[in-house]
Curated annotation (Swiss-Prot):
The modification N6-(pyridoxal phosphate)lysine is found at residue 260. It is found in: Cytoplasm. GO terms for biological process: protoporphyrinogen IX biosynthetic process. The keyword Repeat does not apply. It comes from Methanoregula boonei (strain DSM 21154 / JCM 14090 / 6A8). The lineage of its organism: Archaea, Methanobacteriati, Methanobacteriota, Stenosarchaea group, Methanomicrobia. Gene3D superfamilies: Aspartate Aminotransferase, domain 1, Type I PLP-dependent aspartate aminotransferase-like (Major domain). This is Glutamate-1-semialdehyde 2,1-aminomutase. Keywords: Cytoplasm, Isomerase, Porphyrin biosynthesis, Pyridoxal phosphate. One of its GO terms (cellular component) is cytoplasm. Its EC number is 5.4.3.8. Pathway: Porphyrin-containing compound metabolism; protoporphyrin-IX biosynthesis; 5-aminolevulinate from L-glutamyl-tRNA(Glu): step 2/2. It holds the Pfam family Aminotran_3. SUPFAM superfamilies: PLP-dependent transferases. Belongs to the class-III pyridoxal-phosphate-dependent aminotransferase family. HemL subfamily.
Amino acid sequence: MKSEELFSQAKELMPGGVSSPVRAIKPYPFYTAHAQGAHITTVDGEDLIDCCMAYGPLLLGHAHPEIKKAIAAQLEKGWLYGTPTPYEPEFARLITGDHPGMEMARFVSSGSEATMAAIRLARGFTGKSDIIKIEGGFHGAHDAVLVKAGSGATTMGVPDSAGVLPALVAHTRQLPYNDAEALEAMLASHHDIAALIIEPVLGNIGPVLPEDHYLREIREITSAYGVLLIFDEVITGYRLGIGGAQRMFGVKPDLTTLGKIIGGGLPIGAFCGRKEIMSLVAPQGPVYQAGTFSGNPLSLAAGIATIRWLHDHPGIYPDLAEKARAIGDSIGGGAGGSFVRIGSMFKYFFRDSAPKNYTEVKECDTAAFGRFWEKMRARGIFLPPSQFETNFLSAAHTSDDLATLAGGYTACL
């Protein structure tokens, strides 16, 4: 069946015809038959260079042989037990060892579940009710973080989705990114804040990068007011390097959430932090968290294989950063927009300068992006279909792929 036919069927059986809204490409999404390396093959027989990489998890590319080997070996032994497995302490030791100050980890099944549990834990540890999130920061699809607030520093949250109770998100406040002074002002006047949760690099509207000293400043401010700092590194964890953004920028959060890359392409999440805080998680403490699929052996086997491969190939990170730089260099300064990159994350913003926060991101010309995306798609290049999603490179992108990407940007901008 062709993609259009499949989508016609799906619309009758599934809301919007998709399992996640971002996949609802107009007029209909392509359906993938298989993928290998940096390429997707659609059911219509098209070959596409993939710069979406499943929205971040596939740092090593599609169907990496080491990951396949680890999954296949575990499949022979079974794929779900409902009991602890030897993978759990092994993987927890790997992850905590890669992040300074991180002492304990709890595995869950998604990044959303990880941030939900981390927020609950922060409230349980501090005894305080409210959280702060950054405008434009994405932390999953649970109620506490589905908030769209005004630009005022003290504006209370209002729901960003039908079905979310205003009384619940009244405990979620928003602040602009790259504004440490706004954080200081809020904490000076509000004493009910349990935690600030933040993507150290805004990935779901970007990448939008932290200005000099911003992350260190918010670390100092939260510490001074007894507020926990939660780094949501579901995207940046192992994407920017071993140790993620916190190692890159030299900032130690109290709690960290991980996902995407640590599962090697299988569903996973983790929340991690200091033993003093993590010890409150059940069954050791009173903060409840549980899940049938938490720590499932397939995901952990794939995750361990991924992280061990990264340890064995440290050159991947400078190599990926160079690949992203080369794409930016191919564009030059004459296209009228702004190319932003960090590590293997990159984006061309249809705005004359790199955005510093959510307000500036919203100034981008989304119609121009739509036309650009269609042109790139016609050239066999698959970018995330939104001005507000990050592009990702992988270890599998070859020099030929990069040349095609550079040529596409040059021709389509």
